[in-house]
């Protein structure tokens, strides 16, 4: 897709830094994560040697970890056992993950291939190399399994069918193309390249194609000891279906020469019967008809019976059939004439020609050796053509309706082989492996370094072995002919006699390797020094195997078959025509393998390759056995050390500037906007802008002439991760904006609705308060704080109904699943055996049916909540209170039990608590008197007396319980009523709450005012000035009090909704206008000074004052910090805590009363009542608060002019001007300092705004 350019926006928007992300997930310990042994990537080794690589692979292998990386190359060591690492759970673990997020695995390679296909629209392939038995076939199967599972939509039947057929090719082709060898129980005796084609729209498999390479057909007729024929022969003979047994005369594998001569019929770990069932199932999935399956097994039976044809010598020493019944049954299976079959095996027809004229025809009898060779050639020809037809038939089924341009290729080919006797098959197999090694070198080592030079990238060249010289030794035609050319030339020279052709080939070997140091000629043998080791090949029989053509007599025999599958499919007339055409040289086996190998190289070169290098740890195929010398040899010839060195010095990813911009232009606001490409410059400048916007260090990339090179895969994965999250982030941004807009509308609507409901129906919380006050009206003294006009019965003070916070923690821990109508903190009086009663803190939660009394305990240093008592409200007999202002309430049950006894509790909101109980249980009796009775134990009543006292032992705002007596100071009269709610101040809408994210929420201590969550439409009681109707002992408040000079900054910021001193309420004194100088005045005697003002009685502070003896950090939610030696108000005392206010009443909260000591109020508290004095310019200005400076200026400006004598008028004016200038300077400094402090406090505490919303 081409880049769509779009004009840039003309509006310049200031780019702001995004706020810090607050949704960090909690870190969890992975109990199932295994300890890593060695390093997962060999590039991380501290020392790069073959021995270090071997040691690392050995450690991981013994730990059951068989996979290791070299950059993007996967190293696999065959475990020779099932490790259970390919199940559905493992597959899902690697799905959608890059290779750095998960341990090394073949699934990671498969995921990377599929991701690159989707993301970069490039063909992918995986090259699996290694020697025989190293695990190449298993790796290919697992890659096919992974891609088929992750790429298929389960809802699409057609796609699922393609997936099933692709997977079914594995058991089918393994049965016909794999065999047990000395080194491998499931060795591929052919090569295949599977290409899975994907649709361009949804990247699902729509077709596939298999290319076959060089089946080892010699294995059909002979195997070395302890090896087996192809699996299908043992599957068919051991578990043959009944109809085939009767129709084809199938018996056990020991009956047939081709399956029993190597003396290996059974193999550990191979279940031939089960494998045949899988083969038959695969045939059905692929779509082979019953007739096609019958023909396949008819040919298998024919081959088995052909092998049982044996010979004897006749009188002339020629070969004769030992048992005619065998040939007759073979003729029945092939549906040919038995006599023609016998003649084709024991005779050879030779035609002579004389120039252009046809000559004579001779029937030449064959000896036993020659007849055996013809018999085997017939069996090999039938099996080879049958296998090629099966591959073609599979391709017909896998062919899709639509063509796709993008594929994933999986190469599964025979590994490098070195046997005791090596012939033409081994040289072909090793040649293909040399070609694959050459591809690996070209695409990883040579191509990488060549590209660095071309792109002018800084690079240190690394030496490596290029095996092209070995490939040329085998396949070259000119200037120096190679081995394959010499073989073909030998056949052409002596085509009639195989032995003579072998001798000609042996003579030509000296010319082939004369100047090649990787070749050695031996008598009757020759050595090629392959990349994997030196291999000695035998000349005998090579030319005959290279012919790869059936005898004309055999082809003519099979063309007479009455079975169309034989004479039209396996051996069509075109085959006979090509053999009888003497003008055209038939294609040899070496020609075929050379053409196939070069086609394979061309196909792989068009793909983005992935590599898997397999290693065989031992020759005995035993698990947990690791032969160091053998593995070290493989490490050397695979070139792992050079690969590690180049990888460490190279770059993990490179692509053209255009492709990079196309992929990642979204990541920079300068190159992409709303999904469109808006960059106006060239591609290289766009690449620089993208890397800059993504904060990629310059050390992590280099820019070439046409490409950008990324050094580490972590950088690439980071870019890909940002790209994947781009659209999600854009959608989230739009959602946030929309939610802000909707939230503002909803909040505005709720505010209007709340105001209208209050205006129309009244405030329900205040109505509940008035109802509750009526229950105790005239019967109980009241606390001053209960009589505030802003006091409302909000109920859930701990926020138990909220979706988060400490209240939600309470109900979750205790299992409360009912609606909470009241929650708060208080104390309970508990008595223990042999001890006096003790006041213990508790949490009280009231639902519609139950009172929960909850204890906070520390278990293993963790806070736990335990439900101590559950009291049913319907079981309450009465509640008892005293007539004084104390907070004690007794709950008495009809039938108390040890688990639900009567309780004696103390809580600040006792009137509200009782009101809710009365609302829930209207028949509840409320007893108020001088004593309170409740049952400490069932049937044992306890009486508590209440007395009023003013002694110093009684706290101002609490009580003393001792020996069944509660002593409390006098409260407000029982007839007191709440005044009208004060009018709230007007203010602007705080829009910051719609934009600021990540603000820490606070969980305040119990308070007499509701939390922000439970009271959205009410002002806090602290905001209002309280004026109870009856307050005999209250001292009139001064008009304006001076704040105390503090030695430390304020301990906490002012809560946002608390009243703040408005700047316009305190105006600085305007400078006095300079007047025209007055005319000289006649000097007279100065008048007497005015009398001093009368001394007023010292003002009494509104609350007791206490001095802090220690510093207190205020870390507990709802508390206020204390600064040593600073004086504070203490409004009330509850146990060991006091409600503390600063002297300017800007902050309040709870603090330990033991940290405070009562003291006399400071003189600065009554600065407004002191007599005015003439201001004197200080020698050094002192930093004062803004309020004190303004107060001083006001006092100075209010001094009457008549008090200044006429004689000192000029001196007085000069002094006044100097004082005024000093005051202005001091005022400016104070304002500046105040602003700095305010800004600092705002910065320091911006995240804790909600924490200061403390309750009283």
UniProtKB/Swiss-Prot annotation:
One of its GO terms (cellular component) is prospore membrane. Signal peptide: none annotated. Residues 1054-1065, 1188-1205 have a biased composition (Low complexity). GO terms for molecular function: actin filament binding; Arp2/3 complex binding; ATP binding; hydrolase activity; microfilament motor activity. It holds the Pfam family Myosin_TH1. It is found in: Cytoplasm, Cytoskeleton, Actin patch. One of its GO terms (biological process) is mitotic cytokinesis. InterPro entries: Fungal_myosin-I_SH3, Kinesin_motor_dom_sf, Myosin_head_motor_dom-like, Myosin_TH1, MYSc_Myo1, P-loop_NTPase, SH3-like_dom_sf, SH3_domain. ATP binds at residues 130-137. Residues 782-971 form the TH1 domain. The myosin motor domain displays actin-stimulated ATPase activity and generates a mechanochemical force. Type-I myosin implicated in the organization of the actin cytoskeleton. Required for proper actin cytoskeleton polarization. At the cell cortex, assembles in patch-like structures together with proteins from the actin-polymerizing machinery and promotes actin assembly. Functions as actin nucleation-promoting factor (NPF) for the Arp2/3 complex. This is Myosin-1. It comes from Scheffersomyces stipitis (strain ATCC 58785 / CBS 6054 / NBRC 10063 / NRRL Y-11545). The lineage of its organism: Eukaryota, Fungi, Dikarya, Ascomycota, Saccharomycotina. The gene is MYO1.
């Amino acid at each position: 897709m081409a880049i769509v350019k779009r004009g840039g926006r003309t509006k310049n928007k200031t780019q702001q830094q995004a706020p810090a992300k607050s949704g960090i997930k909690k870190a969890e310990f992975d109990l199932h994560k295994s300890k890593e042994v060695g390093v997962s990537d060999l590039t991380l080794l501290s020392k790069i040697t073959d021995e270090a690589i071997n040691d690392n692979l050995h450690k991981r292998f013994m730990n059951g970890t068989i996979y290791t990386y070299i950059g993007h190359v996967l190293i696999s060591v065959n475990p020779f056992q099932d490790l259970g690492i390919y199940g559905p759970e493992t597959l899902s673990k690697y799905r959608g993950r890059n290779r750095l997020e998960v341990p090394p695995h073949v699934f990671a390679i498969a995921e990377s291939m599929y991701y690159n296909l989707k993301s970069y629209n490039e063909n992918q392939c995986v090259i699996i190399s290694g020697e025989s038995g190293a695990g190449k076939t298993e790796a290919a199967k697992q890659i096919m399994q992974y891609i088929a599972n992750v790429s298929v939509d389960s809802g699409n039947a057609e796609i699922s069918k393609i997936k099933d057929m692709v997977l079914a090719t594995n058991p089918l082709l393994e049965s016909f193309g794999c065999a047990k060898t000395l080194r491998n129980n499931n060795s591929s005796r052919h090569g295949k390249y599977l290409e899975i084609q994907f649709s361009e729209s949804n990247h699902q498999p729509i077709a596939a194609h298999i290319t076959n390479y060089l089946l080892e057909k010699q294995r059909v007729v002979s195997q070395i000891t302890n090896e087996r024929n192809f699996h299908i022969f043992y599957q068919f003979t051991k578990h043959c279906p009944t109809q085939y047994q009767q129709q084809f005369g199938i018996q056990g594998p020991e009956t047939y020469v081709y399956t029993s001569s190597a003396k290996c019929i059974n193999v550990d770990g191979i279940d031939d019967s089960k494998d045949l069932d899988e083969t038959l199932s695969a045939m059905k999935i692929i779509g082979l008809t019953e007739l096609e399956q019958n023909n396949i097994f008819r040919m298998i039976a024919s081959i088995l019976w052909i092998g049982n044809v044996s010979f004897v010598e006749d009188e002339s020493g020629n070969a004769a059939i030992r048992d005619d019944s065998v040939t007759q049954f073979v003729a029945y299976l092939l549906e040919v004439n038995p006599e023609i079959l016998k003649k084709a095996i024991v005779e050879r027809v030779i035609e002579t020609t004389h120039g252009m004229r046809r000559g004579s025809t001779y029937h030449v009898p064959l000896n036993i050796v020659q007849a055996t060779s013809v018999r085997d050639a017939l069996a090999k020809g039938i099996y080879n053509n049958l296998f090629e037809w099966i591959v073609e038939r599979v391709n017909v089924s896998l062919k899709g309706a639509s063509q796709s341009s993008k594929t994933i290729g999986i190469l599964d080919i025979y590994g490098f082989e070195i046997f005791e006797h090596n012939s033409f098959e081994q040289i072909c197999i090793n040649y293909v492996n040399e070609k694959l090694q050459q591809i690996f070198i070209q695409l990883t080592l040579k191509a990488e370094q060549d590209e660095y030079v071309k792109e002018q990238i800084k690079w240190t060249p690394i030496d490596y072995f290029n095996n092209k010289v070995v490939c040329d030794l085998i396949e070259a035609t000119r200037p120096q002919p190679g081995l394959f050319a010499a073989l073909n030339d030998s056949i052409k020279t002596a085509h009639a006699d195989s032995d003579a052709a072998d001798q000609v080939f042996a003579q030509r070997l000296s010319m082939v390797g004369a100047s090649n140091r990787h070749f050695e000629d031996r008598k009757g043998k020759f050595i090629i020094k392959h990349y994997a080791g030196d291999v000695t090949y035998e000349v005998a029989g090579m030319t005959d195997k290279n012919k790869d053509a059936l005898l004309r007599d055999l082809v003519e025999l099979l063309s007479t078959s009455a079975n169309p599958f034989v004479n039209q499919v396996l051996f069509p007339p075109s085959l006979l025509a090509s053999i009888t055409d003497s003008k055209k040289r038939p294609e040899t086996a070496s020609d075929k393998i050379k053409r196939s190998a070069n086609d394979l190289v061309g196909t792989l070169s068009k793909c983005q390759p992935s590599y898997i290098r397999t290693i065989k740890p031992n020759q005995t195929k035993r698990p947990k056995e690791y032969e160091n010398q053998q593995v070290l040899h493989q490490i050397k010839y695979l070139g792992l050390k050079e690969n590690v060195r180049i990888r460490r010095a190279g770059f993990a990813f490179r692509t053209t500037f255009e492709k990079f911009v196309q992929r990642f232009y979204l990541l920079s606001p300068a190159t992409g906007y709303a999904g469109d490409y808006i960059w106006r410059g060239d591609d290289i400048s766009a690449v620089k802008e993208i890397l800059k916007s993504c904060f990629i260090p310059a050390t992590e990339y280099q820019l070439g002439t046409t490409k950008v090179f990324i050094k580490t895969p972590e950088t690439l994965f980071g870019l890909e991760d940002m790209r994947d999250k781009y659209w999600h982030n854009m959608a989230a941004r739009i959602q946030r904006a929309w939610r802000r807009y909707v939230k503002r509308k909803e909040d505005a609507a709720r505010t209007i609705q709340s105001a209208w409901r209050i205006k129309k129906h009244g405030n329900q919380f205040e109505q509940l308060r008035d109802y509750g006050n009526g229950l105790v009206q005239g019967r109980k003294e009241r606390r001053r704080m209960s009589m505030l006009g802003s006091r409302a019965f909000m109920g859930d003070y701990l926020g138990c109904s909220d979706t988060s916070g400490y209240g939600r923690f309470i109900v979750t821990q205790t299992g409360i699943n009912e609606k909470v109508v009241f929650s708060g903190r208080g104390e309970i009086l508990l008595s223990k055996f042999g001890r006096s009663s003790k006041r213990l803190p508790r949490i009280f939660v009231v639902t519609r049916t139950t009172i929960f009394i909850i204890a906070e305990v520390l278990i293993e240093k963790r806070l736990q909540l335990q439900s101590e008592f559950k009291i049913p409200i319907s079981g309450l007999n009465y509640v008892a209170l005293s007539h004084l202002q104390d907070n004690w309430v007794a709950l008495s049950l009809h039938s108390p039990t040890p688990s639900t006894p009567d309780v004696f509790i103390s809580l600040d909101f006792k009137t509200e608590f009782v009101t809710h109980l009365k609302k829930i249980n209207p028949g509840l009796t409320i007893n108020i008197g001088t004593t309170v009775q409740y049952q400490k134990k069932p049937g044992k009543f306890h009486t508590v007396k209440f007395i009023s006292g003013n002694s110093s032992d009684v706290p101002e705002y609490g009580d003393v319980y001792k020996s069944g007596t509660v002593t409390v100071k006098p409260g407000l009269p029982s007839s007191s009523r709440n005044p009208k709610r004060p009018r709230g101040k007007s203010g602007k809408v705080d829009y910051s709450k719609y934009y600021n994210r990540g603000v820490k929420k606070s969980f305040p201590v119990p308070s007499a005012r509701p939390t922000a969550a439970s009271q959205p439409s009410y002002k806090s009681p602290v905001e209002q000035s309280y004026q109870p109707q009856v307050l005999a002992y209250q001292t009139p408040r001064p008009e304006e009090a001076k704040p105390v000079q503090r030695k430390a900054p304020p301990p906490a910021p002012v809560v946002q909704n608390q009243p703040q001193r408005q700047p316009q309420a305190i105006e600085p004194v305007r400078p006095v206008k300079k007047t025209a100088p007055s005319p000289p005045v006649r000097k007279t005697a100065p008048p007497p000074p005015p009398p001093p003002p009368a001394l007023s009685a010292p003002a009494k502070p509104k609350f007791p004052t206490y001095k802090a003896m220690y510093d207190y950090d205020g870390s507990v939610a709802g508390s206020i910090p204390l600064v040593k030696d600073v004086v504070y108000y203490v409004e009330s005392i509850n146990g060991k805590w006091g409600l503390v206010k600063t002297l300017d009443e800007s902050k309040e909260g709870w603090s330990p009363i033991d940290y405070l000591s009562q003291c006399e109020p400071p003189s600065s508290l009554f600065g407004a009542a002191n007599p005015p004095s003439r201001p004197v310019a200080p020698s050094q200005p002192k930093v004062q608060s803004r309020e004190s400076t303004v107060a001083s200026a006001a006092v100075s400006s209010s001094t009457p002019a008549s008090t200044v004598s006429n004689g000192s008028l000029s001196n007085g004016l000069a002094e006044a001007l100097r004082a005024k200038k000093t005051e202005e300077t001091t005022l400016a400094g104070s304002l500046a300092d105040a602003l700095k402090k305010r800004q600092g406090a705002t910065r320091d505490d911006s995240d804790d705004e909600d924490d200061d919303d403390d309750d009283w």
